[in-house]
Regions:
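Non-heme di-metal
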Residues: 1-141
Length: 141
């Protein structure tokens, strides 16, 4: 929620009023539905806290580079100094939890499956964003 508010404020500075935007107008997305339906803690941590946050770190770094190239230093700074470090922390937290939770071969396999499915879904969603909206440098938080 903190990042959403910061991004909405930045969009306002750029001339877009995000107050009327409802990110859930189309309902929950496929990745959220997948994460929400995972039955075990190790799967939820592997898919969400570890993998999804790792994706966010990579996508945010790409977005920072895009903003720098486009000359939008303020947005790049917001992502570089606040959002990306938070996402990196979330990913590291997921890693430390996984080291404790994935203590058996079965738990490790469940974590691997959940992580792989998260990566596949993220790739599908990124492909759809490119095909339908031409978006290829979307941030990941």
């Amino acid at each position: 929620a903190k990042h959403y508010r910061m991004i909405a404020d930045r969009l306002g500075e750029l001339g877009f009023d995000a107050r009327g935007f409802d990110p859930l107008a189309q309902g929950w997305g496929p990745l959220f539905k997948y994460l929400d339906g995972l039955p075990t803690t190790v799967e939820r941590v592997a898919a969400g806290q570890f993998t999804r946050e790792a994706i966010a770190v990579v996508k945010n770094r790409q977005f920072i580079e895009f903003c720098d190239r486009a000359g939008d230093r303020l947005t790049a700074t917001l992502y570089r100094d606040v959002i990306e470090p938070d996402e990196r922390f979330h990913h590291q937290l997921g890693r430390s939890l996984l080291l404790k939770l994935a203590a058996t071969p079965e738990a490790q396999e469940a974590a691997r499956r959940a992580s792989a499915r998260t990566l596949a879904l993220a790739e599908e969603l990124q492909g759809a964003a490119l095909r339908t909206a031409g978006i290829h440098h979307a941030p990941g938080c």
